[in-house]
């Protein structure tokens, strides 16, 4: 009889577990608290991953392999213990090890806070890519800031969002490995001095203020591979306390220097509705870029001893415009520290950087005031000015002296530095994140740049770490898939396509419905434990969970709910398929209208809750403090996936992919990745409404007047008037006025189509086998949205890894 092969990692864990408990806490496994078990298990996993990473990167260096450095202002990592144990294929072994001590591994996971390093889709995408890069075996390091308080903890007080510090480090620091020997000095403010020496023009930066960047490493395991990615996070500190200044009585000045430095790594996206907030955000961005580029250069020099081959051995990827200052920072190092001439330095830079754009909206493309940049980072400002001068000169030559086109393409104009334009000018690749988005970039956002250098522009549709969102989050569905199509899909998402063969198998469809029901029951139990809210699991779970922004049109959803509510108020006994609308979203602290929309959702939920007869049929729930962990519970339980942004405004989305993977039916516009979801699942398995991007542009060109829709549609008028009159005792005049008078995202124009789509999706749900078949086809088509596929496309087409 064959014996089961011993897992060497498991043998090590069994040995280390009681030893570390005794060493750190002086307790045995029988005596240990769940929190102590969490810390010890986490520390063991970190050591295992650290050793794997060292071996992985040593091999990369030995073969002269190219490394990927992924710069992003945010990485929405979620919890690490469960994912790491799963990816290392240790879950069963650890559960077995803990069983004699009556320790429940699922309860241990609950002691880990979500790492407070991100906010929305941008950060979650970055986290998924670190997972995908490790799984596919590409050597990668992410760079970001170690935010002490993350984005914020959202708390609703009488429906109003309040922001509390997200104090994640006490529980999360076990995953951070300090690397103080790699600290880097970052220079702010100061003066520039120019001089010539041996016919070389030197610029010296003097009288600057120094901030010390100290790195902490977080390891990200791949699934079933030798790969381990690293997320290097920088903390900011003043170099030392100025005791002399303090002793002279200059207390405020001595403390202020420390305070400014320490503020840099306190909070993600500080409110920038005032000058101080803008200054802090700029400091954060330069701090991230200077520390990361300095570290990349130091690592490269330690291995190769030259920067001549930097672009051959290093790919630096800019995830949205926040890390754009990495471009002039690398120029600064090459010019000032290494003595390169401009042309050679620029050649290295433009072969090293690639840029992913994440927005098509002009107002969201980052711009910085010239005077602010000149004051805070004077040397970087002077380099940007020179880049712009040379870039504009080359454009004039290329475009036959077309000064108007050159002005449109200029990096500096209207006293502002356009960061996206700088990225396009300096990167060898510019990509969008869905087919539609990439076309919009070429045809409108960067049309002049596309005409100038069409070979730069590419598309890589977003992908998700599907093992986290399916295998870890939805074990019931995973088991059903394994029973029907085998286990190859665990390593290769494309294998999910084989599930489509069962779309007419009533036994499989029944099992699929059973899995969904179990997931809804489990989610309802989770919500009740967390918030006391009771969900009707026999109702449709209609889900819109994403950052709160007008372009995502949560208020379109609200208008339909108000219309349903008015219908039931008029006739409580009217036929109505029970539906629960589930919202979760954070609004930026300074975004007042978004906060009003949250308050309005909460007010509707409260008013309906107070009406027992109606609340049996219609209910609205707003879940506080949306995060990765909440999402992992919600995605498997969702029936309807609301992806209702105005066509042409959402770059791609990733929540739509996670919901599709878990069998939810998309109710959406032809925007972002919804178009590709439609292609993947089939036209009959998605519900599309609203204008297309060309129709939106045509209506805007004709002159969109929302008041006409208000005057001509009774349901629209009734919903908006209800906002004016009040919901649960609170009026929402600002939201109503924004819709009736401006409506920048054409909510009213799409409302009738949206309402009909809602009615149709409800009809589909009532036919249980039809709905299950639609759900199955979504699951089967979701493999294309794997992060493994996405990072492989980046590696082959953009980073040129072999």
Model-derived regions, located:
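A conserved ligand/cofactor-binding region detector
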Residues: 1-802
